[in-house]
Amino acid sequence: MANLNQIQKEVSEILSDQKSMKSDIKAILELLGSQNPTKESLEAVAAKIVNDLTKLINDCPCNKEILEALGNQPKEQLIEQPKEKGKGLNLGKYTYPNYGVGNEELGSSGNPKALTWPFKAPAGWPNQF
């Protein structure tokens, strides 16, 4: 793994390359501005820019590491078959009464303080409905 100093060094190199390419592009544009641009000259400039960028990408050490890692992979991926499927979590069955929910008048809970719907706001609460 690269440490922060190596990463900072590579980033600063890329930044300087980018700045030099920016000045190259400005020089090319000035040259094109002084001439009458033709399709061939524009294609040549575009090809040069693409070639320069491709060279920078291919020369990147991280790109080489990725290609080496991909080259070292086996032709077929080996997937381990799962062993026996274990039983799921042993959760207890749902039990009644479920205190704290339901409507008391429907008999769904034995809790006299169960929540009811529609919700009855306690005294002092603003009326929402």
Curated annotation (Swiss-Prot):
Pfam family, one: Cauli_DNA-bind
Matches recorded under Gene3D superfamilies: 6.10.250.630
Coiled-coil region list: 1-31, 38-59
Cell compartments where the protein resides: Virion; Host cell junction, Host plasmodesma
Region listing for Capsid binding, in residue ranges: 122-129
First-listed, main subcellular location of the protein, grouped into a coarse class: virion
Swiss-Prot/TrEMBL keywords: Coiled coil, Disulfide bond, Host cell junction, Virion
GO MF: DNA binding
Description of how the protein assembles with itself and partners: Homotetramer, through coiled-coil domain. Homotrimer when interacts with icosehadral capsid. Interacts with capsid protein, and with Movement protein.
Job description of the protein: Plays a role in virus cell-to-cell and plant-to-plant transmission. Interacts with virion icosahedral capsid and movement protein, thereby facilitating virion cell-to-cell transmission through plasmodesmata opened by viral movement protein. Also interacts with aphid transmission factor, attaching the virion to aphid stylet when the animal feeds on an virus infected plant. Aphid saliva may later detach the virion, inducing release of infectious particles when the animal feeds on a new plant.
Protein name, entry field: Virion-associated protein
